[in-house]
């Protein structure tokens, strides 16, 4: 839903005359010079005094007519010039510096909410009755959050609001009541509001999701919600802050044929005046961002393996693919109850597949919503990655039922307490249920590397990042809150011991259940459980940005010196950026085992090893840092793979590539190390090797073709032996590890243009399109589609496009869509880009073909040109206040590798508002800078290496 930013002072009235006396604060704010430039710009020659008079005349209202003041300033801030009558309201905001929060003269205790969507007008009628605790009866105003809401009436008891003042930019509405209203109540007060909202199509608040009925082919809509972080205010007037918890009793009204769902189970349901009315039981005390309700045609499957109903809902014809998630949900809830020693408190658990969904999933208490592909699973037609993805997403959202729902962060800088814990717990439970997946090994190449990649940018942020206002919150739902947060928890669990860690977490959850907590509360609980000073050690990691590189030097006689410095991918750390001393657990691995006692808590430290022939820092990659060795040590470690665990081998590959990219070591050290590991048996290590080579190839994307061909030749020589040994026949008797290894090697060989493998892939595709639907194993279907796209041609494009329109599974649909972006021909690229706005591709999926375009020069250029040309439409479809525009900006810009492109990108956005995605843009520019510096620095040395080793 586009956020309409009003710059003029306007009156929104339900009548004709504008007479009477306005609230004094209205006049004070409108007239104060601080607001004038943002509120009303008069024609040339109009005097300043006349401008004030015009605004004042426009703002005069007779109750109960309404005025909206919509400007770029808050109604009340620490320095607002409110009138004396309302000065106390202004002062209420001073209690929390650097945050724009609601006044606390009243706080919510309970909501009775009724909503009725209209699928013809795409609006909804609503009423909400909020029980308020009155903290300051001297103040006769109530301020709460609203967005795109048409308020019809508001009253407390029998007293109607005299004025309603909406501040669109701040997303608040203030209801003013006659003097003495609040003091007349002996107990709590009840605020009744009637309103109309927009059933928008922007995947925020209460919105409509379009889909094609699988059984009839009709276009239909479901009405669903996405409230996090601050979009409950789009669905109903509320106190939309995480620490303003309350209980909710929700009622839904619609056509009787539709299913009604909400957080709780049904209390009563009946038909009145031809409409179905469903009343749900009252929720526990919870935050507004967890409120959820759905009105749609739905069917379900269920699992009876838990003490309460566990269901997976989907639109008719899709529900059969929900059984995997239903069974996993039942098993996971039981596991988490046992792990935490706290019972899941709600009477049911519903999971719902939503057709248009901006995120992967949302942990609404008792009613978790998902993107379709992240919940429904056709195991016979899905990749291993998809199976694992569904499992991890489901378990992530179920972990939130405790982390986030039962205990909620006090404010958004504590988001990592929600997301970091849920990420760590999803890996923890996956490892319990599927040990053959080797998730803790995959963690190193997945979660940890994602965290380090983003945190190596100058534009990164601390785990606990200050958040002032609503439009800043979406930008911190990133790899820092999720992946670095989870990595920090893994580091703590290794330090304290897993059993002690879980014990402390359980104490934390029990102490703060149904309430809010801060990071320090977690540290204190872990300290109580372990007896260690957790707070002083871990506060540095959460409150400071970045991570260190540990440089290791040797004197040749057994003395090893470790030195820490802030790491940046651009390797240009300034002195004022290198002041933090991180507490680093060195976890030194030698032939005698692992010494976990060595902690680097100063700039440098020297120790002595009896036998320095073998050692590795950061055993199992449990620490959040990278290690830089001497060239000689890199060479030795490359030859000592048999002494290293899978995590250690993955860590070595990741570290040497990262250090090559930033210039801490030569890229030849990376190429030399991986070239010796052509007999590696672990799919996890191979994943990291291939990912690292792919990262290098993306940096060399705009280099001459012969250089790119030489890199492909290097890859072919490295992987061909293992690829051809394994083959590409997938058997049901193959273990998970064997299947994953086959997929990884087959994909790498196709990308490197191994002639035999490419030929096999193309034959599979030909046979598949000729009617043999078994010709392409589901596990490698995306690889085959990408290979076909790289070969190109209009005929192949038509075949892939047809698969996208009529897929046999959601997995296949997305694989085909992504591969459409891999076709290089200009006309085909133009055609793919055209689908993004003509309804062929859902808004939630427009980034998918963009991912394919980033694989080749032509796509990177075409995508950027399209972004520039269609910028206004992008902003309209993907409002900056939501999250997807930032993703599109990143995809549209970060594929470049030259400083010249940085100048061009900066010039384009210099005339645009970057509000809501400024951090994404800064990170993208940092990424381009890093790549440009890498290729400029090591171009010659890489060319020399490739030529000397016969790859040209």
From Swiss-Prot:
Q: What cofactor does its activity depend on?
A: Zn(2+)
Binding positions for Zn(2+)? 396, 400, 419
What transmembrane ranges does the database entry give? none
Please list the GO biological process terms of this entry.
peptide catabolic process; proteolysis
**Keywords, sorted A to Z:** Aminopeptidase, Cytoplasm, Glycoprotein, Hydrolase, Metal-binding, Metalloprotease, Mitochondrion, Periplasm, Protease, Transit peptide, Zinc
Q: Give the family, as the similarity comment puts it.
A: Belongs to the peptidase M1 family.
Q: Tell me which residues bind substrate.
A: 228, 360-364
One short Pfam name that applies is: ERAP1_C
Return the cofactor note field.
Binds 1 zinc ion per subunit.
Please list the residues that make up the transit peptide in this record: 1-52
Q: Where is this site: Transition state stabilizer?
A: 482
Q: What positions does the record give for glycosylation?
A: 381, 713
Q: What is this protein called?
A: Aminopeptidase 2, mitochondrial
Q: Which GO terms describe its cellular component?
A: cell wall-bounded periplasmic space; cytoplasm; extracellular region; extracellular space; membrane; mitochondrion; nucleus
PROSITE patterns in UniProt = ZINC_PROTEASE (PS00142)
**Record EC number:** 3.4.11.-
State what this protein does. Answer: Involved in the cellular supply of leucine from externally offered leucine-containing dipeptide substrates.
Q: Which residues form the active site?
A: 397 (proton acceptor)
MF (Gene Ontology):
metalloaminopeptidase activity; peptide binding; zinc ion binding
More info? Present with 2910 molecules/cell in log phase SD medium.
Locations listed in the record: Periplasm; Cytoplasm; Mitochondrion
């Amino acid at each position: 839903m586009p956020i309409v930013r009003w710059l003029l002072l306007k009156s929104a009235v339900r009548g004709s005359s504008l007479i009477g006396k306005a609230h004094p604060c209205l006049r004070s704010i409108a007239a104060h010079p601080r607001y004038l430039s943002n509120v009303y710009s008069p024609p040339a020659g109009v005097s300043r005094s006349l401008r004030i008079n015009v605004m004042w005349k426009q703002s005069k209202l007779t109750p109960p007519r309404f005025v909206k003041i919509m400007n770029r300033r808050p109604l009340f801030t620490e320095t607002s010039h409110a009138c004396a009558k309302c000065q106390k309201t202004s002062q209420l905001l001073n209690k929390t510096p650097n945050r724009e929060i609601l006044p606390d003269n009243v706080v919510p205790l309970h909501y009775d909410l009724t909503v009725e969507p209209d699928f013809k007008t795409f609006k909804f009628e609503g009423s909400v009755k909020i029980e308020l605790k009155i903290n300051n009866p001297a103040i006769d105003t109530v301020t709460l959050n609203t967005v795109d809401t048409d308020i019809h009436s508001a009253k407390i008891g029998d007293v109607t609001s005299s004025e309603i003042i909406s501040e669109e930019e701040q997303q608040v509405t203030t209801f003013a009541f006659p003097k003495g209203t609040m003091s007349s109540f002996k107990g709590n007060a009840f605020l009744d509001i009637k309103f109309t909202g927009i059933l928008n199509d922007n995947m925020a608040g209460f919105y409509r999701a379009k889909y094609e009925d699988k059984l009839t082919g009709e276009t239909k809509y479901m009405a669903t919600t996405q409230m996090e972080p601050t979009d409950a205010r789009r669905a109903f007037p509320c106190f939309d802050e995480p620490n303003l918890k309350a209980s909710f009793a929700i009622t839904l009204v619609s056509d009787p044929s539709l299913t009604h769902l909400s957080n709780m189970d049904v209390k009563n349901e009946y038909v009145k005046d031809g409409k179905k009315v469903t009343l749900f039981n009252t929720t526990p005390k919870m935050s507004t961002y967890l409120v959820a309700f759905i009105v749609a045609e739905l069917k379900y499957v269920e699992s009876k393996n838990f003490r309460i109903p566990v269901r997976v809902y989907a639109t008719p014809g899709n529900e059969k693919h929900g059984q995997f998630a239903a069974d996993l949900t039942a098993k996971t809830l039981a596991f988490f109850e046992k792990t935490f020693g706290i019972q899941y408190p709600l009477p049911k658990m519903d999971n719902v597949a939503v057709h248009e969904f901006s995120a992967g999933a949302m942990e609404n208490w008792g009613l978790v919503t998902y993107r379709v592909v992240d919940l429904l699973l056709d195991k016979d037609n899905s990749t291993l990655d998809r199976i694992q993805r569904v499992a991890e997403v489901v378990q992530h959202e179920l972990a939130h039922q405790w982390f986030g729902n039962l205990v909620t962060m006090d404010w958004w800088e504590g988001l990592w307490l929600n997301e970091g814990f849920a990420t760590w717990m999803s890996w923890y439970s996956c490892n319990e249920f599927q040990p053959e997946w080797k998730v803790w090994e995959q963690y190193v190449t997945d979660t940890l590397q994602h965290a380090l990649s983003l945190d190596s940018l100058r534009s990164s942020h601390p785990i606990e990042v200050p958040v002032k206002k609503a439009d800043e919150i979406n930008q911190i739902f990133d790899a820092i809150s999720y992946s670095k947060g989870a990595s920090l928890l893994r580091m703590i669990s290794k330090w304290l011991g897993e059993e002690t860690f879980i014990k402390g977490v359980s104490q934390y959850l029990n102490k703060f259940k149904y309430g809010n907590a801060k990071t320090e509360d977690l540290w204190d609980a872990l300290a109580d459980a372990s007896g260690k000073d957790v707070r002083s050690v871990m506060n540095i990691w959460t409150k400071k940005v970045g991570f260190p590189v540990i440089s290791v030097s040797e004197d040749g006689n057994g003395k090893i010196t470790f030195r820490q410095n802030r790491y940046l991918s651009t390797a240009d750390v300034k002195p004022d950026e290198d002041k933090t001393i991180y507490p680093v657990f060195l976890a030194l691995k030698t032939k005698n085992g692992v010494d976990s006692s060595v902690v680097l808590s100063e700039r440098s430290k020297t120790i002595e090893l009896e036998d320095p022939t073998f050692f590795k820092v950061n055993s199992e990659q449990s620490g959040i840092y990278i290690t830089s060795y001497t060239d000689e040590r890199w060479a030795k470690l490359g030859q000592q793979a048999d002494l290293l665990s899978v995590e250690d081998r993955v860590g070595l590959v990741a570290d040497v590539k990262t250090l090559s990219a930033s210039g801490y070591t030569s890229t030849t050290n990376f190429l030399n190390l991986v070239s010796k590991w052509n007999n590696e048996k672990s799919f996890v290590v191979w994943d990291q090797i291939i990912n690292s080579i792919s990262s290098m190839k993306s940096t060399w994307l705009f280099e001459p073709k012969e250089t790119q061909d030489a890199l492909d030749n290097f890859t072919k020589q490295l992987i061909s032996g293992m690829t051809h040994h394994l083959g590409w026949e997938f058997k049901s008797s193959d273990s998970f590890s064997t299947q994953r290894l086959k997929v990884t090697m087959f994909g790498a060989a196709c990308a490197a243009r191994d002639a035999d493998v490419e030929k096999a892939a193309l034959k599979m595709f030909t046979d598949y399109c000729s009617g043999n639907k078994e010709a392409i194993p589901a596990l490698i279907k995306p690889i085959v589609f990408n290979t076909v796209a790289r070969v190109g041609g209009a005929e192949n494009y038509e075949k892939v496009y047809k698969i996208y329109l009529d897929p046999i599974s959601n997995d296949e649909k997305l694989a085909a869509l992504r591969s459409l972006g891999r076709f290089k021909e200009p006309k085909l690229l133009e055609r793919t880009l055209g689908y993004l706005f003509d309804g062929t591709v859902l808004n939630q999926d427009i980034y998918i073909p963009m991912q394919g375009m980033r694989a080749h020069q032509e796509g990177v250029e075409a995508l950027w040109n399209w972004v520039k040309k269609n910028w206004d439409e992008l902003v309209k479809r993907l409002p900056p206040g939501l999250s997807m525009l930032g993703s599109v900006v990143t995809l549209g810009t970060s594929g470049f590798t030259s400083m010249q492109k940085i100048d061009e990108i900066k010039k384009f956005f210099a005339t645009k508002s970057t509000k809501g995605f400024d951090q994404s843009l800064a990170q993208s520019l940092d990424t381009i800078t890093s790549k440009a510096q890498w290729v400029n620095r090591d171009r010659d040395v890489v060319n020399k290496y490739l030529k000397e080793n016969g790859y040209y």
